[in-house]
From Swiss-Prot:
Keyword Phosphoprotein: no
Key words, A-Z: Cell cycle, Cell division
Family the UniProt entry places it in: Belongs to the MinE family.
UniProt-recorded name of the protein: Cell division topological specificity factor
Keyword Cell division among UniProt keywords: yes
Role: Prevents the cell division inhibition by proteins MinC and MinD at internal division sites while permitting inhibition at polar sites. This ensures cell division at the proper site by restricting the formation of a division septum at the midpoint of the long axis of the cell.
InterPro entries: MinE, MinE_sf
Length: 93
């Protein structure tokens, strides 16, 4: 009887553990998918400012917002410089 209880109780614990892990994964995924309303406008404004000083296209600018621990936001802006594109094209030819 103890063997019977051991086998069936373990399955419930494993299922509960898997359920909790899945809930954590889903919550993290949802947290990262939330895009603030101002982010597209921020990208547009940054592009306009950068275009004053360099020949930048929208594809050369990447803006991402990452949330950490619920109270810390990290804004990451990546800009590919036109000179870098020209150097890569010359090296690939």
């Amino acid at each position: 009887m103890a063997l019977f209880n051991f086998l069936f109780s373990r399955k419930r614990n494993t299922a509960n553990l898997a359920k909790e892990r899945l809930q954590i994964i889903i919550a993290k995924k949802r947290q990262n998918e939330i895009i603030p309303d101002y982010l597209p406008q921020l990208k547009y404004d940054l592009l306009q400012v950068l275009c004053k000083y360099a020949s930048i296209t929208p594809e050369m600018l990447s803006v991402q917002l990452e949330m950490k621990n619920g109270d810390i936001s990290i804004l990451e802006v990546q800009v590919i410089r036109p000179e870098m594109l020209d150097n890569n094209r010359l090296n690939n030819e």
